[in-house]
Amino acid sequence: MSTATGAPNASAAPAPSAAPAPSAAPAPLSTPATTAADAATPASPGTGGGFARRSRALGWRLRFAVLSLIWGFSFLFIKVGTQGFAPLQVTLGRVTFGALVLMVILLVKRERLPRSARTWGHLAVAAFLLNALPFSLFAYSELTIPSTLAGICNATSPLWGMVLSVVALSEDRPTRRRVAGLGIGFLGVLTVLGAWQGFAGTDLTGTAMALGASLSYPIGWIYVRRTLAGASHSHLAMSSTQLLLAAAQLAVVTPLFTTAPTGLPLVPLLAVFALGALGTGFAFLLQYGLVAEVGPTTAQMVTYFVPVIATAAGVALLDENLSWNTPLGALIILAGAALTQSRPRPATTPSPTTIPSSAAQRR
């Protein structure tokens, strides 16, 4: 599933959800199949084949950079959006604009939404856990904490994911490396919050909301993995349905807890539009294009760039203060998250009829 800010998380990779947070793990897509003609045609010698390979490499790296920027700036867009609209209104606009983008693509590709009531029911739960709830919590959190801190809290999703997957997914057993990563990651959280200072200067309510949003993502991923894994519908159809359901949920709740805005301030409105159309809609297409081209392992590395970009954007464009422990803690969190997502390489046993080469022996 992909979240709005998403970045991938290997601990629980279900069928995809609608766009975000940088910590969600996309379900591995099949690499586009090689046709018979492709297989029968050798690569052109000389500069032609090399140029094509370099162009493809540049293409996915450019999309990777754009995806990192979009998701990194999502926290800035949230902060700016809440300066003109209530948090629930920001979230409603976000999922609505994101759903519109995906629906347009769905119509262009002539795909259909799922028809099964069971699928819609499970997607309604996924929409709440992966979109409506975490998006709202992040929006509320940024009323009292800087966007930099929200972006860093988002990077804790892989840590929560490892803890929950051990409990909920019997096939996902912890290793020493992953347990060490979990401990390192939470040490990073304490560093960001300045625990040795008694959390002085930190709004604990806002921080708890941001951490709660990050916790909601792996809960949603695990739910989808247990209920919708193997669904026959395309990622685009499933994600479009999920965002439509999230928009419907928020359309019911938002009027109950907010009053209609007296105006439509331009800058916050543009921020909400960018947050939805780019960070929740267009980013979905980029993410799954990357997964299809370079695989989920490389695509999920975007996770580690999002908090860096979120921090840089908040400091440079919103003039947010940055104490020394914030970037240090962020680096510790990312190191821990990387360890929790690591997998040992499978041992290779040489064929009994093959004498290992010296290079293989050195490895």
Predicted regions and their residues:
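Specific alpha-helical transmembrane segments that line the substrate/conduction pathway
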Residues: 89-100, 130, 135-178, 213, ...
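Juxtamembrane helix-loop-helix junctions in multi-pass membrane proteins
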Residues: 69-99, 140, 146-152, 219-245
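Specific transmembrane alpha-helical segments of multi-pass solute transporters/efflux pumps
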Residues: 70-78, 103-154, 164, 189-191, ...
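Transmembrane alpha-helical segments that form core, pore/gating elements
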Residues: 102, 161-163, 182, 199-257, ...
